Design a protein with these regions (language model features):
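An N-terminus-focused feature that recognizes amino-terminal "leader" regions
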Residues: 6-68, 75-78
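Conserved active-site tyrosine of GNAT-family acetyltransferases
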Residues: 32-37, 121, 155-160, 219
Length: 290
């Protein structure tokens, strides 16, 4: 605490500056467009990946990357989203429900948020904007993973010692939960469970970090780098205990430097309330706060 009463540590961010996207493969672009754009009200990126081999979906300053593959990928946990109007979201989801019949799609309003499952089984929890998400009005504030019992503490140590990102370890209903800070209004959450966890299928997330070489050196030394993508990017999959080397969890990280050419690119978000019957001139785009 400083002399003037400010706790400067509350403004620390850590080495991971932002989570940029979550990547899951999908087998059907038309279904994905119906769910992500018409249902959730998000926006297909008009500048990148506009062909049938992939689609990028914008959500504030973050994205979903959805490569077209025969086998869909399912994240082992929950993807958190913030949206400005949950009532409008509910109406959109009800509208697209008949078009998603026969898939794993479901939606349910519960305790101030909306729980949604995509056509292939990915789970989303959608919140209204609030102080727990900073000034984010539309975006991807967290991803929560279900992890084996006895791993949450070691996962936190990995992020602190290897990735240089601060974390907290708490108990929630007698379950250990690690929360890793990834930028000013985002986090990765690792919640222990006694239930069986599906085998990892290759989905990934992308982060930007400030100290790019330090984590790489540690990962390289321990033979954990899985791809040397470019001068600005590398990848790893296994999260290990930094002291024992025991594998704790698998989730591919696409690690980008703060000099990556795509950092800060303009991400367009449409206003999903616009329609032909009630069109408002000059309100096509949605102004977001990261």
């Amino acid at each position: 605490m400083s002399e003037n009463g400010f706790d400067r540590s509350t403004q620390d961010v850590g080495n991971i500056l932002a989570m940029e996207h979550v990547n899951v493969c999908i087998p059907d672009q038309q279904l994905a467009q119906t769910f992500y754009a018409a249902g959730l009200g998000l926006t297909r990126d008009p500048y990148m990946m506009v062909g049938p081999e992939n689609m990028w979906i914008n959500v504030g300053q973050q994205q979903f990357h959805l490569p077209t593959r025969e086998q869909p990928q399912v994240l082992r946990g929950t993807i958190g989203l913030v949206m400005p109007d949950l009532e409008a979201l509910k109406q959109r989801l009800m509208t697209v429900m008949p078009r998603l019949d026969g898939t794993k799609f479901s939606c349910k309003a519960d305790n101030g948020h909306v729980d949604v499952t995509c056509p292939w089984g990915n789970h989303f929890r959608i919140h209204a904007q609030g102080p727990q998400f900073g000034d984010m009005t539309l975006g991807l504030p967290y991803v929560e993973f279900l992890v084996p019992q006895g791993t949450a503490s070691g996962i936190g140590q990995f992020y602190k010692e290897v990735m240089q990102a601060p974390y907290t370890l708490t108990q929630d209903m007698n379950v250990a939960v690690t929360k890793v800070k990834v930028g000013p209004a985002q986090c990765l959450i690792f919640r222990e469970t006694s239930e069986d966890i599906p085998e990892y299928d290759g989905h990934h997330l992308a982060v930007y970090i400030a100290n790019f070489s330090g984590p790489h050196a540690w990962l390289k030394k321990h033979d954990l780098v899985t791809q040397e993508s470019s001068a600005y990017q590398y990848r790893f999959v296994d999260i290990v205990h930094p002291e024992t080397g025991r594998k704790l969890f698998a989730i591919e990280h696409e690690v980008r430097s703060f000099t990556h050419p795509m950092l800060g690119r303009e991400i367009l978000n449409r206003n999903p309330s616009q329609n032909i019957g009630g069109y408002a001139r000059g309100r096509d785009t949605f102004a977001t706060v990261a």
